[in-house]
A protein has these predicted regions:
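S-adenosyl-L-methionine-dependent nucleic acid methyltransferase catalytic domains
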Residues: 1-151, 233, 240-406
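Active-site-adjacent helix-turn-beta-strand microarchitecture at beta-sheet edges
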Residues: 143, 148-265
């Protein structure tokens, strides 16, 4: 059912928030022509088979993670099969896991998506170093498995900005007239060619077993622009300028996206909340504006909020009423900024000072008169909330809180 009074737009393939069993909802979406084969990106952060129950900051029950072993693997496999059918032919899926089940789920993903469509095993630093008392190395990482539905997929390579130190180390030369930093690279490549790139240029033949990277006419144009460096022995090399570089290509180890609760910063309080900048990287890399993004375990709604911020449409699913309530709070109050802070700030609510019970939508500020971290408020109203019986009755309190907060 569509919850009455909650939809504020919600075109057939627009933003949708579902409350219920994601297996049943994914199955239903297979019959929706606006969704099947139209999802450009899937990100899921499923339970990690911890056999634990999780609570929010206010001690509200959030969800249980009680599956393990073969039952857990089958639970994920069933959902991956449906998610593959919902993906577009050029779509991608990212599955976020920890060390317990990542290896088992990779085998399942090889089966469902094909081993040739495996792209990356991404290692993410999730927290600060730990002082472990047990005999093992500190567990500070988790993993993201990146697969695509086919060899042709949307991909916008992410880059990190050059630091001054690294730029000076890799681009070691400075062009005197302009002050531009550059490095020198060969203008030849392996392999013999008998066309234009195999002919002499300026009286120089390519080195044995090699060919010029560019035809002689292109090399002439480059030289006329000052882009060829000639050594004292007459050896030509190409100048590559730092200011023409897009940045440092991102690799498969991500150190900058620790979880919010490991950064002592203002968050929603949901136990599995992910860093918004992590989702920004994934969404920007594997989708375009207007594309449909799906999160089948949407939790605190980070994926949905970031997708809206970046101009994507989205579908979010969760079977926890606390999760849906947290999503609505986030939609009403906006994303909080991520960042590192040297000094710990104990977060308390204004209501806590008066001994009143906290609510999901209350205003959280820092204690001891420290100003609250500025909020990047972006209210999200263009979505529809769907809940099937018998689930819908559990949402009443959260819906009413959300509507009062608008």
């Amino acid at each position: 059912m569509l919850w009455p009074g909650v939809s504020a737009g919600g075109a057939p393939a627009g933003n949708r928030l579902y409350y219920g069993d994601n297996l049943l909802i994914l199955s239903d979406l297979l019959g929706d022509d606006c969704v099947r084969g139209k999802v450009r990106l899937v990100y899921i952060d499923p339970p990690f088979a911890t056999q634990s129950a999780f609570e929010t900051r206010s001690q509200s029950h959030a969800y249980e993670d009680l599956l393990a072993g073969a039952n857990y693997v089958e639970y994920i496999r069933e959902r991956l099969i449906f998610l593959r059918e919902l993906l577009s032919s050029d779509g991608s899926i990212y599955v976020h896991l920890d060390q317990k089940m990542a290896f088992a789920i990779k085998i399942i993903m090889d089966e469902v998506f094909g081993s040739t469509n495996f792209r990356n095993w991404i290692t993410r630093k999730k927290c600060n170093p730990k002082n472990y008392t047990r005999k093992a190395y500190g567990n500070v990482s988790d993993f993201i498995l990146f697969y695509t539905k086919s060899p042709r997929y949307v991909w916008h390579r992410p880059f990190r900005e050059w630091t001054a130190e690294r730029g000076a180390r890799e681009y070691t030369y400075v062009e005197k007239p302009t002050g531009r930093r550059y490095k020198k690279v060969p203008i030849h490549a392996p392999g013999v060619r008998h066309g234009e790139t195999g002919k002499p240029w300026r009286g120089l033949a390519p080195p044995p077993g090699k060919h010029w990277q560019f035809p002689p006419r292109t090399l002439e144009e480059m030289d006329s622009r000052g882009e060829i460096h000639w050594s004292t022995t007459g050896n030509p090399r190409r100048k590559i300028y730092l200011d023409n570089s897009k940045g440092v290509p991102v690799q498969d180890i991500w150190l900058e996206f620790r979880d919010p609760h490991n950064q002592n910063i203002k968050i929603t309080g949901y136990p599995t909340e992910k860093n918004p900048d992590l989702l920004r990287r994934i969404i920007n890399a594997s989708s375009d504006q207007g594309d449909l993004v799906l999160d089948g375990f949407c939790g605190s709604g980070t994926t949905l909020a970031v997708a809206s911020e970046l101009g994507r449409r989205w579908i979010g699913i969760d079977n926890s009423p606390e999760a849906i309530g947290t999503v609505l709070r986030r939609f009403a109050r906006g994303l909080e900024p991520m960042g590192d802070f040297v000094r710990r700030q104990r977060l308390v609510s204004k209501r806590a000072r008066t001994s009143e019970p906290p609510t999901l939508f209350e205003d959280w500020t820092t204690d001891q008169g420290v100003p609250a971290i500025g909020s990047r408020v972006r209210m999200i109203r263009d979505f529809s909330l769907f809940a099937s019986e018998p689930y819908s009755g559990e949402l009443k309190r959260y819906i009413e809180d959300w509507q009062r907060s608008l």
